[in-house]
Amino acid sequence: MEYERRGGRGDRTGRYGATDRSQDDGGENRSRDHDYRDMDYRSYPREYGSQEGKHEYDDSSEEQSAEIRGQLQSHGVQAREVRLMRNKSSGQSRGFAFVEFSHLQDATRWMEANQHSLNILGQKVSMHYSDPKPKINEDWLCNKCGVQNFKRREKCFKCGVPKSEAEQKLPLGTRLDQQALPLGGRELSQGLLPLPQPYQAQGVLTSQALSQGSEPSSENANDTIILRNLNPHSTMDSILGALAPYAVLSSSNVRVIKDKQTQLNRGFAFIQLSTIVEAAQLLQILQALHPPLTIDGKTINVEFAKGSKRDMASNEGSRINAASVASTAIAAAQWAISQASQGGESTWAAPEEPPVDYSYYQQDEGYGSSQGTDSLYAHGYLKNTKGPGMTGTKGDTSGAGPETSLEGGTDSVSLQAFSRAQPGAAPGLYQQSAEGSSGQGTATNSQSYTIMSPAVLKSELQSPTHPSSALPPATSPTAPESYSQYPVPDVSTYQYDETSGYYYDPQTGLYYDPNSQYYYNAQSQQYLYWDGERRTYIPALEQSADGHKDTGASSKEGKEKKEKHKTKTAQQIAKDMERWARSLNKQKENFKNSFQPISALRDDERRESATADAGYAILEKKGALAERQHTSMDLPKLASDDRPSPPRGLVAAYSGESDSEEEQERGGPEREEKLTDWQKLACLLCRRQFPSKEALIRHQQLSGLHKQNLEIHRRAHLSENELEALEKNDMEQMKYRDRAAERREKYGIPEPPEPKRRKYGGISTASVDFEQPTRDGLGSDNIGSRMLQAMGWKEGSGLGRKKQGIVTPIEAQTRVRGSGLGARGSSYGVTSTESYKETLHKTMVTRFNEAQ
């Protein structure tokens, strides 16, 4: 706190022109090389030498100091120190003083109670908070004694260390040990309070332990501190309130990083202080707290903003590694899910196909706590053989993993645990009976979905779902479905991950795809979707299996109607995409090459969730996800193109019509009509849902995006010959059209226009040069002659009263350029009215006469 007396200019001259008699400056430089700004008095040296005691201070200064203490005690405030600033040479008061309080609350209460003013010995004094120290780029800080030196000093004011040595970065422990941080007294920088009593013992560390603990961050020490693991809903006021007992900060010192879309903070904030010493002291205080610093129920991690990278590895697995694993596994998941959902007609892979090991995807990832169980797609997973975390063999319906059990008429799928625990979330069980139809008779089969609690952290590799051919007869009893309920996902807490392009959910450990609105579990390599009615995450694989059953049940009705629906396999879709990519490269147009046609779902098919299907989202993101991967890797084919592929559950339930002759015979309007779901009022081509039928029709008629997607959809079903013809037509349209040449060829070249007629007819007389009328002399008909005749002048007489002037008019003569008046050869008697021939003749005559 600063008390400044509003006196005259002479009372405050000591602040700017005082001399400095310290021994380290020598006898040559006796004047102080700075302007004595109102910096914090705690940065002033405490011992000024023996000269300090020689001055006899006046009684008024002592009375002022006692008056300040008396007023503080009358208000019940005990100040830690009251220091009146004096001139070192004269001992006179410099007109201001500092009052240090024990707590920030006492200083604030004192300022508010006195309204920033005080009466001392009949003099009105204004009170202000002490100003911060000069900026670090103006003055330099001594790392040995901690004194702030002015920028023009070549050595430290207190300890005499040269500037080059004092500015070298020392270990943080050495600097903090030499400061008075554990003492909680005067050597603290501005804005920081002393260490509380319980934490002073923690601050007094040995130099070895402190240097070892702070060595990584001391190399990157700066004046900015970062706070990590903030609550997304934490505000600036909550951060300032949590740091109020340890530092005097304002909103200008704290910067909270917010998300542009949600306007919530992204989990971290920066605190910028005036100097590195203040940042180091505040960092030491916050790191020494036991229990650690908490803001809005979240434990905060504090470190230098530009410190070394932290070791992100933890017991439950690295989040960054999980993100890279997720982005690497997506391409393989396209083929694995399609192979896993074939149904009862096919197995996981052909027995004669050579074994393929996909464990190289996990190379150098270190994902999770174990290496064997965390492989993305191990050989046992694809081949239905024994693998890490699996106890069953191929064809064995009972020997499943520890989390998988098969009973009569029940398919049990256990979803692996989420990667992070959610405290206090005890999910309940939600049971719902599901009835299905089989081809042999009317019976009910139930499926049990068991989604483990987020509190479970151990991940185990699950065995794949057995095909429907392994189910017992249709006389199995009915069992209810059990689901684990979870809170509604909070999108505001999601964090964007650049490696995978997904949003990471810190509560469940899942990765969210905003385009397809599906969740990806990096541990179980499964896609999930949120079911609002069941309040749980449902695997997309099971959803596709249900759709496959419904498709098989409704196939008989289709046969009765003599209508056979073709399906696209993954290989056919890949061929369509390659053909479409070739046409785009030829046209050099920027179309989206990851389009896949979608067929409208029939009313009697299975009731799906509000989100899009996982199979379409996976196949659509094939090209985009391949570009996101850091290392390009080719996926081996799981099945040969020559072998006819049976219908697959995931693709057969949601894919469009196949590229066959039967499809080509159908009309374009019929195929385009299937791209609209009138029941749900959704455009399946643009993947948009509308509130009313009128809005959907208006979208189809006016939307440019719909027209562009429709053109892409039409081109995707054209043959190669039609594409070439269309390409040739487009190239012809892109050529330059010379419309002027077309007009000349059609109408001919027009005749040039006739010249404009003159306003006055007849041939005009030849123009006479303006000097020609005076060539033969001036006549008596000019205006000058008439004016002279009016004044009594007669032709042949001279000018003047007595006719003594010139008789003939003065004629203009030409002289040589650059010659002076009267110089020899300057004039040859040539006038401006003479022609070139006459001028040349006179010049030659004049030169001849001068030569003689």
Curated annotation (Swiss-Prot):
Taxonomic source organism: Rattus norvegicus
A molecular function (GO) term: RNA binding
GO biological-process terms attached to the record: 3'-UTR-mediated mRNA stabilization; cardiac muscle cell myoblast differentiation; mRNA splicing, via spliceosome; mRNA stabilization; negative regulation of cell growth involved in cardiac muscle cell development; negative regulation of cell population proliferation; negative regulation of mRNA splicing, via spliceosome; negative regulation of ribosomal large subunit export from nucleus
Protein's recorded name: RNA-binding protein 10
SUPFAM superfamilies: Ran binding protein zinc finger-like (SSF90209), RNA-binding domain, RBD (SSF54928)
Zinc finger (RanBP2-type): 135-165
Sequence positions bearing Omega-N-methylarginine: R824
Bias type Polar residues, positions: 430-446
Modification type Phosphoserine: residues: S61, S640, S645, S655, S658, S660, S703, S719, S767
